């Protein structure tokens, strides 16, 4: 977590990173800096962490700070100490350098316990390589390697341990100071590569629309249509929806895809039901699909139903308003009742399932929410 006091003219406010675009905009509005471009503001104070005091009394790019905040928020174990000690060792004091450092911590092993040669060797190699066999912790090769490390004199004593620089591990500059490298910070459905004029950005949907705006601006693209999109990953375990999402991206664009991704991005979203509802409603575009997803509870989904007899049985068993007394159940005409349900609630068989809407919200109201309704012939 990073907290800065940012200043614009005579106004200043606190802002914590990482933050959402909405939170950043709210902070900018508080100091009347919402129209400042590029988004570089003066840092009057680094509230925390103290180790980033190099950012104080200078102008910084808030999007860079936010990206760094996300990277630091993902640090695990002693990685934050590694980061600070490597930063001091290298003399890094710019945001591009700090962002790149966050991707290169494997170059800087930090050994906190130097009393056990085996642990020294193993921790060093684990940092550099990322993984080691779990069943050879007692292998003497680690102690031999640890002893050579200590005898080399290359370790630098720091506040948090003995810092080494692995010369065989190159320092890779993923961030060029303009376009952010790929980094998945939060759970997402769609991971896309956006390219224009030799530059690359990455989109993680669903996201705030302004995040897409900023990515395209960093690319220098005149319009969204000028950006070439390709898929890195899609986290939807449903082949039909995977193909539908790709079609929407190609035919309608990333903003429409983002709205749909936001609508379906919930742990309890039943994609099979949504697919059936979309067929039932004959949804034409991403906007209508998103509205159906937001109103999915308006629809009753009878999975695997092919006959009205099944509908009658389902409704009488699952809707207390239509419960049938067991003493007369054998005389009840479930098929006729199922047909009645289909008629009054506009039910339809679709793809081996049955969909109906027994709420006060009509299908037309759902499909055309926020759209002007027109009357034919006028």
State each model region's role:
Residues 7-9, 114, 143, 159-160, ...:
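Residue-level signal for functionally critical sites in structured catalytic/ligand-binding pockets
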Residues 141, 333, 367-378:
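Non-Sec secretion/translocation targeting segments of pathogen effectors
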Residues 147-181, 339-371:
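Long, highly charged low-complexity segments enriched in Glu/Asp and Lys/Arg with interspersed Ser/Thr
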Residues 1-2, 11-13, 37-42, 138, ...:
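Generic structural motif recognizing short loop/turn segments at the entrances and edges of beta-strands
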Residues 28-139, 161-186, 206-330, 365-368:
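Mixed-charge (acidic/basic) macromolecular-recognition segments
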Residues 1-26, 182-209, 356, 373-377:
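Short, extreme N-terminal segment that most often corresponds to the first beta-strand
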Residues 14, 130-150, 321-342, 347:
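Amphipathic alpha-helical packing elements
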């Amino acid at each position: 977590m990073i907290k800065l006091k940012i200043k614009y003219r005579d106004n200043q406010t606190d802002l914590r990173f990482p933050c959402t675009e909405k939170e950043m905009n709210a902070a900018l509005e508080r100091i009347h800096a919402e129209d400042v471009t590029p988004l570089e503001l003066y840092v009057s104070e680094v509230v925390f962490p103290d180790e980033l005091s190099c950012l104080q009394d200078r102008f910084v790019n808030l999007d860079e700070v936010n990206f760094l905040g996300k990277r630091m928020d993902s640090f695990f174990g002693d990685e934050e100490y590694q980061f600070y000690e490597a930063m001091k060792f290298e003399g890094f004091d710019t945001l591009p350098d700090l962002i790149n450092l966050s991707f290169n911590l494997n170059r800087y092993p930090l050994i906190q316990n130097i009393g056990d040669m085996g642990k020294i060797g193993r921790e060093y190699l684990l940092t550099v390589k990322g993984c080691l066999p779990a069943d050879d912790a007692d292998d003497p090769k680690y102690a031999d390697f640890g002893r050579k490390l200590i005898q080399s004199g290359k370790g630098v004593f720091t506040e948090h341990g003995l810092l080494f620089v692995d010369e065989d591990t190159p320092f890779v500059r993923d961030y060029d100071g303009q376009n952010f490298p790929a980094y998945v910070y939060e759970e997402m459905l769609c991971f896309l590569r956006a390219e224009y004029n030799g530059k690359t950005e990455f989109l993680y949907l669903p996201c705030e629309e302004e995040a897409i705006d900023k990515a395209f601006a960093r690319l220098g693209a005149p319009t969204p249509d000028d950006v070439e999109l390709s898929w890195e990953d899609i986290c939807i375990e449903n082949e039909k929806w995977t193909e539908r999402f790709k079609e929407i991206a190609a035919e309608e664009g990333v903003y429409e895809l983002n709205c749909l991704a936001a609508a379906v991005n919930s742990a309890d979203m039943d994609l099979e039901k949504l697919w059936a509802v979309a067929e039932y409603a004959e949804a034409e575009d991403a906007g209508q699909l998103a509205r159906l997803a937001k109103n999915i509870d308006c629809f009753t989904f009878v999975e695997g139903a092919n006959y009205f007899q099944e509908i009658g049985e389902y409704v009488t068993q699952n809707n207390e308003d239509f419960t049938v007394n067991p003493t007369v159940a054998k005389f009840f005409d479930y098929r006729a009742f199922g047909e009645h349900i289909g008629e009054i609630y506009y039910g339809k068989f679709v793809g081996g399932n049955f969909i109906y809407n027994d709420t006060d919200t009509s299908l037309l109201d759902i499909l055309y929410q926020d759209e002007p309704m027109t009357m034919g012939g006028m």
